[in-house]
Amino acid sequence: MDDLMTNIEHYHVSLTTGFLPPSAPLTHLPQKYYEPWETLASSLPTRIRDGSLRHQASLIPLLETDFLVTDAEWQRAYVVLGFLSNAFIFCQYPPSERLPLSLAEPMMNVSCYLGLPCVPTYSGQTLWNHCYISEIQLPVLEQVNTLVSFTGSREESAFFGISVAIEKCGSPLIRTLLHAMAAAEAGNEKELTACLSKAMITIDSITSILPQLYGRCSPSFFYNTLRPFLEGTQDLKSAGLPNGVFFETKNGGSYQKFRGPSNAQSSLFCFIDIALGIEHNDNSFLTEMRQYMPGPHRDFLARVEAIDSVRHFISANPDASQLQEAYEGCVLALARFRQIHIRLVARYIVIPSNGTKTADQSSMGNGLSSEPVSIAGAQGTGGTKPVEFLKVIRNDVLESLQAS
């Protein structure tokens, strides 16, 4: 445990910022060589609106990734290429079956370096794609801005910013829950109780952030305007692309099929579950989502999994009433978060899906198509039925109390 705490930065995790980078993400790649990427990314909302994106993307030269040096540069490249790629594919209906060489080749190379699939993920749209408008230590939603955007809208910034604010607010849980696991390992009941009580307060603070999205990002904007750009390449059969999207490469190319970005790709909540010993009865989707987390984060979670969760110690000490109460409070706080998240998803996905607008009514891409705006219907962008999935996750959280 001491070794893990000492070398935590090796896993691109910070005791201060959690899974967010310790320094602000790059707003621009420093090498002029990559200016074609940056120029198109900066004009992305305009190019999508006027219908010129695919033409402009076809003019970009094939750029090698050899000149990317720092982790921040690789992350910035992944953000830019991820947005450009999904914008190219989904800016019009039907989606493009092919991603041109100038985007596909570097996207595959950058993704491979970062240990990610060649598709936009939670990390690329949230962890590495934000800046703080002001220097207040704990950002609220108004203080988070998106660096690369499909629409250029404050509503889009609010949608992605809510996850940034949650990650920042939840960052103290890294230290708190690692200390809790160390206390359990050492049999220190008093310290473990204190850590769990502290964790409960932090989780409740996270939960209080979720409703801030209401009024800042409308369900109509999210579902009809933003969400089409958050699709993956896996569930496109209904759009006539059963094989996914063909990524052109210098060696020919191949079809790629990956899920879209999902909050299930957040390493923070996976870490919380591991530390508290919350087991999921059907974890196949959550296990798959690990592959959509940055490689170092996956390695960190694997290290934490190798340590006994606090639940083992708590189960072995049923008469420690204060400890049991602290654990119960922590788990119930997490269940409250899951419940509020269910309500949010119902408002932003399920309800709009019952009255889906067509693209000419909702400004998907250039607004010329009459095809349904959402390929996935009431599915989440990760390919699940979101409310059903989240209810199972919430119930798994509550079941951990019965088994403790």
From Swiss-Prot:
Where does the secretion signal sit in this chain?
none
- Where along the chain is heme b bound? H341
**Pfam families reported in the protein's UniProt record:** IDO
The cofactor note reads: Binds 1 heme group per subunit.
- State if Metal-binding is listed as a keyword: yes
Instruction: Cite a GO CC annotation.
Output: cytoplasm
Give the main EC class: oxidoreductase
Q: Which domain of life is it from?
A: Eukaryota
Cofactor(s) recorded in Swiss-Prot or TrEMBL: heme
Specify the pathway.
Answer: Secondary metabolite biosynthesis
Q: List its EC numbers.
A: 1.13.-.-
What is one process in the GO biological process aspect for this record?
L-tryptophan catabolic process to kynurenine
What family, per the record?
Answer: Belongs to the indoleamine 2,3-dioxygenase family.
Q: Which PANTHER family match?
A: INDOLEAMINE 2,3-DIOXYGENASE
Task: State what protein this is by name.
Answer: 6-hydroxytryptophan 2,3-dioxygenase fscD
Name of the gene encoding the protein in the UniProt record: fscD
